[in-house]
């Protein structure tokens, strides 16, 4: 058995982006949000994910812009560190080690070099207590610095970041907990407390849920469980304080936010309606309804042009100041629980699972982006606590991705159970699934499982239910409507036992159906019962056929913590082992099978082939939660790994979902390094960011450079020093600081032109030499006519005695011979 080597469990996306309030950059071009152990940066114009700020080892719990630099952002995490980032380029600037788990982060313009954190302190009675502390950030050239200078500002505060807010730029801080509002003044170093009764005259719930401070006035807005909003004034006096009450929300107010100039107050709650209250006249308000899930956070940009709302369905809405939604950033929708399995759409290769109520969501794992929702229930969802509504509980694709089967139900009690079986056909025109058939009474009791045939030649759906029957559904032609619909083709049962699981073999020739402790094998062509396999004690929990060379094996797990492997050729038990398997998942492209085991409050992973009981790979303590959902995702390009422990990841990648709704995957260090070098690398050549444009043009320039090297001598190659610098500046300067394209065009073209100054000078010199030689030849011809013999003798004597001269010396001599010395005659004539 190969033990754990360099394979690690990593978050592959889908983390909560609504965990903390999103923040908008000062120029309203970027929105930053917490996402698991990283911070995601999105564009407000395109809603596209730009990059991640990765470096924390635990959940990020707060983010805030650096008041001294608008292009920097602080982030705090439960790992006990605060990091300072350049969020434009995604570069980590500095890490401050605090040493305590951090739950929220606040900054103030009037407190330079100081940040405020909510930390957890354990008291003598082992009760967790939260404190607000001020941390003085030391100035150091080192990248990692310890910041141990903490001073307590307030004790026994709420860990909810919405219950703490700074007022008047940092003159005071307001924080609420239960029924008490506290205001701490930094200059006076004094705290004033104000309390409310548990219930008022109308039996309302007065507990505080959030607070917000006006940016310029002495006013504090508080939200409460009963949906009321209170505006507190004169809170610098214990007895003379006043408050006014406004009420619109029918349930708890989740978040409050003043606009930067303080002219409006924004509020949000479970109603999915953003309410804008006019500060001067609270009776005037505007509404932006139907935003999706309940609003959990509200934030505004520094210029007041954009608002952001974070929703319970893991979505961020970008809203203009005119109260118009301009963009949506949708993460992996995280409901209370996932009823369907994790599936891969054969066409789009997207991850498919439960989305918002009554929908299936299609999510791109490669881009970490929500693609679209498919409305299964096709009914308006009412956001009201305790209301029983339809939910999608089962879904499955056929082999080609042409058909989708879903089961929706409502009613927690058997007598009130109502469910529908729906079959959806893929429409090539709309590139989506269209409802084809609805079966209102597919079974008399709840459907427990369903699966499509794995054969591409026939399309067949099998369902099992607690009514003791399994049914096979096939397509039937409708002559009147000129289309196919689905109908029941066969009904099977076994000794009045209740079936729970079903699956087809790799070639679709055998159907396996489990009836409590008995395995039954059926022929889909004749519906003949081929054989039964007597399972060891315990009801069958899961079934899985082997693939490729292991297709003759059938795996099953039981409630008695047994994993069994059956040989279908001999109809005998090949091997079995005692292990509590919570999820059994086969790889469609190999013989490998992954088994998640839950023991001692931890989940462990075993990867094996059914033909070999000894695991190929094992990793203990994968996560703390139980894993019930997993899927193998085929890779677009096979990953060639020579390491024996990583070979099971070559063709497919294993994803799994925890009870905490964290989507995780297994990745090798080699694969992460390869991805980092290709797409996440931040510096190269003089610490310049790598962009796709640079990689494309840079490759072309390297090829051209190689070609020039092969065809020309090094001394003959022109130097493009200035042009190269210009091109580098154009390619590597951040887009937000570049001038307009019209200005860059002429500069870029000029930089590509070869400088001809040296060539022109050389050409001029050559022309002068040619003219000089021509004139010299003419002069020599004239001299030959008058004294040819003397010239011949002089020339002969020179040829015999002169040393070899360089070309430069010869040119100089020729120029001297050309010089006009006629001016000397005047001197000779004037001599007495």
UniProtKB/Swiss-Prot annotation:
GO terms for biological process: positive regulation of rRNA processing; positive regulation of transcription by RNA polymerase I; ribosomal small subunit biogenesis; rRNA processing. Pfam families: Beta-prop_WDR75_1st (PF23869), Beta-prop_WDR75_2nd (PF23769). InterPro entries: Quinoprotein_ADH-like_sf (IPR011047), WD40/YVTN_repeat-like_dom_sf (IPR015943), WD40_repeat_dom_sf (IPR036322), WD40_rpt (IPR001680), WDR75 (IPR053826). WD repeats lie at residues 4-43, 47-86, 90-134, 148-187, 196-233, 239-278, 281-320, 326-364, 378-425, 432-474, 485-523, 527-567, 572-609. Keywords: Nucleus, Repeat, Ribosome biogenesis, rRNA processing, Transcription, Transcription regulation, WD repeat. SMART domains: WD40. Component of the proposed t-UTP subcomplex of the ribosomal small subunit (SSU) processome. SSU processome is composed of more than 70 proteins and the RNA chaperone small nucleolar RNA (snoRNA) U3. Ribosome biogenesis factor. Part of the small subunit (SSU) processome, first precursor of the small eukaryotic ribosomal subunit. During the assembly of the SSU processome in the nucleolus, many ribosome biogenesis factors, an RNA chaperone and ribosomal proteins associate with the nascent pre-rRNA and work in concert to generate RNA folding, modifications, rearrangements and cleavage as well as targeted degradation of pre-ribosomal RNA by the RNA exosome. Involved in nucleolar processing of pre-18S ribosomal RNA. Required for optimal pre-ribosomal RNA transcription by RNA polymerase I. This is WD repeat-containing protein 75. The lineage of its organism: Eukaryota, Metazoa, Chordata, Craniata, Vertebrata. The gene is wdr75.
């Amino acid at each position: 058995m190969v033990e754990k080597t360099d394979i690690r469990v990593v978050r592959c996306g889908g983390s909560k982006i609504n965990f903390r309030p999103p923040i908008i950059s000062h120029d309203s071009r970027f929105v930053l949000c917490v996402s698991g152990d990283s911070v995601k940066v999105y564009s407000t114009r395109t809603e596209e994910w730009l990059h991640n700020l990765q470096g924390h080892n635990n959940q990020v719990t707060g983010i805030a812009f650096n008041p001294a630099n608008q292009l920097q952002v602080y982030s705090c995490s439960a790992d006990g560190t605060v990091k300072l980032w350049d969020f434009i380029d995604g570069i980590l600037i500095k890490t401050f080690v605090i040493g305590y788990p951090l739950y929220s982060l606040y900054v103030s313009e009037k407190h330079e070099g100081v940040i405020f954190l909510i930390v957890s302190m354990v008291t003598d009675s082992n009760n967790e207590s939260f404190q607000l502390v001020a941390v003085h950030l030391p100035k150091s050239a080192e990248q990692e610095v310890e910041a141990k200078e903490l001073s307590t500002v307030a004790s026994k505060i709420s860990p909810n970041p919405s219950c703490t807010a700074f007022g008047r730029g940092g003159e005071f801080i307001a924080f609420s907990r239960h029924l008490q509002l506290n205001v701490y003044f930094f200059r006076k170093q004094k705290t004033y407390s104000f309390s409310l009764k548990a219930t008022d005259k109308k039996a309302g719930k007065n507990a505080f849920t959030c607070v917000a401070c006006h940016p310029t006035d002495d006013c504090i807005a508080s939200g409460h469980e009963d949906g009321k909003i209170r505006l507190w004034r004169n809170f610098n006096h214990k007895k003379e304080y006043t408050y006014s009450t406004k009420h619109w929300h029918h349930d708890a107010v989740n978040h409050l936010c003043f606009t930067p100039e303080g002219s409006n107050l924004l509020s949000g709650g479970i109603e999915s309606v953003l309410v804008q209250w006019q500060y001067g006249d609270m009776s005037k308000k505007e509404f932006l309804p139907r935003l999706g899930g309940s609003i959990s956070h509200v934030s505004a940009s520094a210029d007041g042009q954009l608002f952001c709302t974070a929703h319970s369905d893991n979505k961020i809405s970008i809203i203009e100041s005119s109260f118009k939604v301009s963009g949506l950033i949708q993460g992996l929708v995280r409901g209370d629980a996932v009823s369907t399995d994790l599936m891969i759409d054969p066409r789009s290769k997207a991850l498919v699972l439960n989305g918002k109520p009554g929908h299936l969501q299609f999510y791109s794992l490669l881009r970490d982006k929500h693609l679209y929702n498919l409305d299964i229930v096709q009914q308006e969802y009412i956001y009201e606590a305790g209301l029983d509504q339809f939910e999608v509980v089962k879904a499955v694709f056929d082999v080609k991705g042409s058909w989708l089967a879903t089961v929706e139900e409502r009613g927690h009690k058997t007598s009130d159970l109502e469910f529908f079986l729906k079959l959806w056909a893929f429409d090539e025109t709309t590139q989506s699934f269209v409802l084809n058939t609805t079966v209102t009474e597919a079974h008399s009791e709840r459907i427990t499982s369903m699966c499509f045939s794995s054969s591409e030649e026939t399309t067949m759906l099998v369902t099992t239910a607690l009514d003791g029957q399994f049914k096979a559904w096939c397509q039937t032609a409708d002559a009147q409507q000129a289309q196919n619909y689905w109908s029941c083709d066969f009904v099977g049962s076994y000794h009045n036992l209740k079936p729970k699981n079903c699956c087809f073999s790799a070639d679709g020739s055998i159907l396996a159906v489990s009836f409590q402790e008995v395995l039954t094998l059926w022929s889909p062509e004749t519906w003949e019962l081929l054989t039964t396999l007597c399972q060891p004690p315990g009801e069958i929990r899961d079934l899985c056929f082997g693939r490729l060379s292991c297709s003759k094996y059938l795996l099953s797990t039981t409630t008695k913590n047994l994993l069994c492997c059956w040989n279908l050729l001999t109809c005998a038990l090949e091997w079995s082992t005692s292990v509590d398997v919570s999820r059994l998942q086969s790889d469609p492209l190999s013989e490998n099978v992954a088994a998640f085991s839950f023991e001692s409050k931890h989940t462990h992973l075993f990867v094996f082939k059914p033909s070999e009981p000894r695991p190929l790979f094992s990793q203990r303590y994968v996560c703390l939660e139980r894993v019930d959902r997993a899927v193998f995702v085929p890779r677009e390009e096979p990953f060639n790994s020579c390491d024996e422990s990583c070979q099971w990841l070559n063709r497919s990648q294993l994803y799994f979902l925890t009870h905490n709704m964290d989507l995780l995957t297994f990745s090798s260090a080699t694969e992460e390094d390869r991805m980092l070098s290709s797409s996440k690398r931040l510096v190269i050549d003089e610490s310049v960011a790598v962009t796709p444009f640079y990689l494309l043009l840079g490759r072309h320039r390297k090829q051209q450079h190689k070609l020039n090297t092969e065809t020309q001598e090094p001394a003959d190659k022109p130097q493009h020093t200035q042009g190269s610098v210009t091109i580098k500046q154009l390619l590597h300067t951040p887009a937000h600081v570049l001038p307009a394209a019209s200005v860059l065009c002429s500069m870029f073209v000029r930089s590509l032109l070869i400088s001809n100054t040296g060539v022109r000078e050389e050409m001029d010199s050559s022309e002068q030499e040619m003219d000089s030689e021509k004139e010299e030849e003419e002069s020599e011809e004239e001299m030959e006519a008058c004294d040819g013999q003397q010239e011949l003798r002089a020339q002969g004597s020179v040829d015999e005695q002169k040393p070899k001269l360089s070309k430069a010396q010869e040119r100089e001599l020729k120029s001297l011979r050309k010089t006009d010395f006629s001016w000397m005659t005047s001197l000779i004539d004037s001599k007495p």
